[in-house]
Amino acid sequence: MESLFFAMRIITLLFLLINSSVFANFQMNENMQKTYIHIINLEFDKANELLWTEQKDNPTNKIIILQENYIDFLTIIIGEDEAFFTAAKDKKSDRIDFLQAGDDSSPYYLYAQAEVHLQWAFARLKFEEYLTAAYEIQKAYSLLEKNQENFPDFKLNKKGLGFLHTLVGAIPNKYQWVLSLAGMEGSVASG
């Protein structure tokens, strides 16, 4: 009887280990929180060191991609280097695909995709790719709205939606019809 119990424990442990390594995840762990602090302090070398460590130790963590995208976004916005922008924008599609392969029951699943779209929208605005930027803003908006429905207590949704509602609300009334066509609404007050 003990050997059967032992065998069941081993099988259960193997199942958990296999599932945790096979299924993609979103872990905003301590390492990723430190990385974020380095990024917002524009300490990209330190952030990249932590990202490399996380990639080695936890390669299925989808937050890595979000942080890498944030570094590229800030590099583009601050550096205004069109060559870097052109080279980096090829990564966007792969990053979205990678995030979409994640755990869709996580509040980070849609949020991370929305953040990538939003960051690229503003990078594109910087280099006058207005039509694509508008599409990306609309995509980010719809992803955040859906995530807000699914995870109403997830605070990061409120950050993104607040920003977008303020942005939408600041658009002059004579252009609000365009936003209606895109399914977007908001106001400075609601943002």
Predicted regions and their residues:
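Positively charged n-region of N-terminal signal peptides that target proteins for export
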Residues: 1-11
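Boundary at the C-terminal end of the N-terminal hydrophobic targeting segment
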Residues: 22-26
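N-terminal glycine-rich anion-binding loops that anchor highly charged ligand groups
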Residues: 64
